[in-house]
From Swiss-Prot:
Disulphides: none
Modification Tele-8alpha-FAD histidine occurs at: 43
The protein's name: Fumarate reductase flavoprotein subunit
Binding site for FAD: 13-16, 42-44, 49-50, 420, 436-437
Gene name as annotated: frdA
Function per UniProt: The fumarate reductase enzyme complex is required for fumarate respiration.
Length: 714
């Protein structure tokens, strides 16, 4: 039996895994990265719109800082995130942007002078300062107070992945693709690597290491309609679950992106709306301002997805053979802007829908017939233009994943996790656009360093016989799938699982349907034990791969559905129509799912409390819908009083905003990442002879004083 030894084993070749591999090589570790696909084809490349970091370079970004990015992230999560992790993230993100620039990412840059833009559906002129010429530009994204999303046109993930992959190769990281991790090797609650199948030869071998980091991405493919690539099936997270020790966090927290192309499901980046694109119904009316007057199309993703579906349910969706949808109008931005800044979107729309989204030519007035005249809140009907893109919400992102602490350590010692595969818990119950492509790079930096330190100190304490036993177990399972007498077809089971998840565990959830979904998923899981693969070869066998992955996917589907059924509240992307309020009194916690015994047919669910008294920002009104639509935590007022007292006392002592922040909620972070981020406006403050950072303490005070002005719950 073949066994390969290394210091650091990283499973997953996207942004998180590759950035962590660089951290390991920088400490002199023998590092191996295993990937299902050539690493430059990892799903990180599909990210289009941009990466959030508070640089405050451009006109619409002025005044931005870590505090505002932190506030947006916490509110966006519907107070479900780990606030210490959010602080680590927002502090490191500006450094990550500049590191990526030094590695060759061609960030779109500021050009001095006037530039046209579309804001709130209106054409405006933005004037950039001469002294900011050449600095990194940011665009607007949903749920943010400032234009913070740095970008490379609409191919941000692609350029980032290529730059990080090149840097990993420069450091001579051993990258091996076409490798599929089947199971983790573990003993005495410690992880020592993984059993791996070569997708080309079918050979099953072991990779034994001092430390293992999982970075295999999300689990979107358990749904039928998703923007995720075929490799995003959650098998890595499921393998962690199957150890019986590692736990999954917040699996019911599944994000549905508002603008997926109909019918293909390919993502139409949030940058379309961030740059000024608008959503229209079948009558050509812009409808989002009627639902969300402040943020409109740039409300958080969970909010926009719900509003689109609500509008369709009212009968305002455009008809198509693939179901009702609404229109995304970016022709309003002008052909020059679309062809320059949204060229991938244009190419996708033309290739997969036969639509040129820059085309503003009037196509027909048929859609205006029968348009209501007594609903002025939705605006005036207008003739459909050729360039409007058909879109509707589809599964997009996994907020849940393998539960880790802020250092990336899982419940299984020696196993770390980073990126979308992890529940680090940066995103809580809703992720902000632009934080996804940020997270794997930032997590790869932070967790990669902690992981490398672990590998430097750890020892391999497992004998060859135990490793070979893990290999044999996987070999026996492959033999069983190929030669058992079962009659079940893997594709029939997999397809029905996806349909159940779409129909009953989607954007809107309800107890009875969740119970039905749970029952059917249990039946499918039982049937999956009798799958027999028709193609009998071990090598180059996609049917065999689908067979062993489908059982893992069903375990994840059960975790998602059981978590959704038990959580009797609505929080972020988890919307229970039978429990419409967010309930901080009962549900300010994190769901933990485990599978301690292979004999179980359901996950074990427990909860991890979020401590209000340690939060920098206590749970409050999120800014969408009715202000009273949540049940406050009983300790909220006590924590608010503590926060306010601390801010006022430290302000009197002349402390700056960063010193105030550390007093409110200390957090651990490597010194090189915790160092203060410098911005161009800091130099202007120095030039005026003012105390650096002190001018922002009042912003922090306003943020925590809002409850005294009646801006939280009623």
């Amino acid at each position: 039996m073949k066994i390969t030894y290394c210091d650091a084993l990283i499973i997953g070749g996207g942004l998180a895994g590759l950035r962590a591999s660089i951290a390991c090589k920088q400490k002199g570790l023998n590092t191996i990265v295993l990937s299902l696909v050539p690493v430059r084809r990892s799903h990180s490349a599909a990210a289009q719109g941009g990466m959030q970091a508070s640089l405050a370079n451009a006109k619409k970004s002025e005044g931005d800082n870590e505090d505002l990015h932190f506030l947006d992230t916490v509110k966006g999560s519907d107070w479900g995130c780990d606030q210490q992790v959010a602080r680590m993230f927002v502090t490191t993100a500006p450094k990550a942007i500049r590191e990526l620039a030094s590695w060759g990412v061609p960030w779109t840059r500021i050009k001095k002078g006037d530039r046209p833009a579309v804001v709130n559906g209106e054409h405006v002129i933005i004037t950039e300062r001469d002294d900011r010429h050449g600095y990194i530009l940011s665009r607007d994204f949903g749920g943010t107070k400032k234009w913070r999303t740095c970008f490379t046109a609409d191919a941000t993930g692609h350029t980032m992945l290529y730059a990080v992959a090149n840097e990993a190769l420069h450091h001579k990281v051993d990258i091996q693709d076409r490798k599929d991790m089947l199971a983790f090797i573990h003993h005495d609650n410690k992880c020592y690597g993984a059993v791996v199948r070569d997708l080309i030869t079918g050979e099953i071998s072991a990779y034994v290491s001092k430390g293992t980091l999982l970075a295999t991405g999300g689990y979107g493919r358990v749904y039928k309609h998703t923007t995720n690539a075929v490799i995003c099936d959650g098998a890595g997270a499921a393998s962690a679950l199957e150890t019986g020790v590692a736990k999954l966090g917040n699996m019911e927290a599944v994000q549905f992106h508002p603008t997926a192309l109909v019918p293909s499901g390919i993502l139409m980046t949030e940058g379309c709306r961030g740059d000024g694109g608008v959503l229209r119904d079948k009558f050509g009316r812009r409808f989002m301002p009627a639902y969300e007057p402040e943020k409109k199309e740039l409300a958080s993703r969970d909010v926009v997805s719900r509003r689109i579906l609500e509008h369709i349910q009212k009968g305002y969706g455009a008809k198509s053979p693939y179901g009702d949808h609404v229109w995304l109008d970016i022709a309003i931005l002008g052909r020059n802007h679309v062809e320059k800044n949204l060229r991938d979107v244009r190419d996708i729309a033309m290739t997969f829908a036969g639509i040129d989204p820059a085309d503003s030519e009037e196509q027909t007035k048929d859609n205006m017939q029968g348009a209501p005249t007594n609903e002025p809140e939705y605006g005036q009907a207008m003739a459909k233009q050729k360039g409007w893109i058909p879109i509707k919400p589809m599964q997009h992102y996994s907020m849940g994943g393998v539960r880790t602490n802020p250092k990336g350590e899982t419940h299984l010692k020696g196993l770390f996790c980073a990126g979308e595969a992890a529940c680090w818990d940066l995103h809580g119950f809703n992720r902000l656009g632009g934080n996804s492509v940020s997270e794997p790079v930032v997590a790869g930096m932070i967790i990669g360093d902690y992981f490398a330190s672990h590998c430097l100190e750890a020892q391999i304490e497992i004998n060859t016989q135990k490793v070979e036993a893990f290999i044999k177990e996987s070999q026996d399972y492959m033999h069983f799938l190929l030669h058992n007498e079962g009659k079940e077809d893997v594709y029939e089971i997999r397809e029905r699982m996806k349909e159940v998840m779409d129909e009953k565990v989607g954007v809107f959830r309800e107890g009875k349907k969740l119970e039905e979904a749970l029952k059917e998923l249990q039946e499918l899981y039982a049937r999956s034990k009798n799958i027999c693969v028709k193609n009998k070869v071990l090598h180059n066998n996609p049917e065999l791969e689908d067979a062993y992955r489908t059982k893992k996917m069903l375990k994840l589907a059960l975790c998602i559905t059981q978590g959704a059924l038990l959580r009797t509240e609505s929080r972020g992307a988890h919307t229970r129509i039978d429990y419409p309020k967010r309930d901080d009194e009962k549900w300010l916690n994190r769901t933990l799912a485990s599978w301690p015994s292979a004999e179980q047919d359901m996950p074990t669910i427990e909860y991890e409390e979020l401590d209000v008294m340690k939060m920098e920002i206590s749970p409050d009104f999120r800014g969408y819908g009715k202000k009273g639509n949540f049940i406050p935590h009983p300790k909220k007022e006590e924590r608010d009083a503590e926060i306010l007292k601390t801010i006022l006392e430290l302000e009197k002592l002349g402390k700056d905003r960063i010193e105030v922040q550390h007093a409110l909620m200390p957090f651990e972070l490597q010194e090189k990442y915790k160092a203060r981020n410098m911005r161009l406006e800091d130099e202007e403050v120095r030039a005026r002879g003012e105390h650096l950072y002190s001018f922002n303490v009042h912003d922090l005070l306003d943020q925590h004083n809002a409850n005294l002005k009646g801006e939280h719950h009623e």
